[in-house]
Amino acid sequence: MALERTFSIVKPDAVERNLIGEIYHRIEKAGLRIVAAKMVHLTEEQASGFYAEHEGKPFFPALKEFMTSGPIMVQVLEGEDAIARYRELMGKTNPEEAACGTIRADYALSMRHNSVHGSDSPESAAREIEFFFPESEICPR
């Protein structure tokens, strides 16, 4: 197993429902360490930059609208096989298909309002972390 970092977002729907602490508890209980975190309210420009790979897709405008609708929590997680472990903890994108006990099965309202985001590869983790956090803001534990 390899020590790695992944990127996570607690999305506006979960922040609005005061689920940050519950989600952080699950992250830490799963053996992942939060090594950087902050609350931000994305501008349309920031959302466009972060989700640039989806520009031109039919869901892009709605995605930007949702992700700019309220504050989000962004965090860097660190641990053994952090990417795979966090993706398992999140559950499938569609909460109806997510395994019982996963974040999305328990908290997601819909496929769009699915409470959390997590990087899907080492490359996307590096890009997403760099988008929000300079290395000086990450505190290995």
Swiss-Prot record:
Its EC number is 2.7.4.6. GO terms for biological process: CTP biosynthetic process; GTP biosynthetic process; UTP biosynthetic process. SUPFAM superfamilies: Nucleoside diphosphate kinase, NDK (SSF54919). The active site is at 117 (pros-phosphohistidine intermediate). Its cofactor is Mg(2+). One of its GO terms (molecular function) is ATP binding. CDD domains: NDPk_I (cd04413). It is found in: Cytoplasm. ATP binds at residues 11, 59, 87, 93, 104, 114. The keyword Protein transport does not apply. It catalyses: a 2'-deoxyribonucleoside 5'-diphosphate + ATP = a 2'-deoxyribonucleoside 5'-triphosphate + ADP; a ribonucleoside 5'-diphosphate + ATP = a ribonucleoside 5'-triphosphate + ADP. GO terms for cellular component: cytoplasm. PANTHER family: NUCLEOSIDE DIPHOSPHATE KINASE (PTHR46161), NUCLEOSIDE DIPHOSPHATE KINASE DDB_G0292928-RELATED (PTHR46161:SF3). Belongs to the NDK family. Homotetramer. This is Nucleoside diphosphate kinase. The gene is ndk.
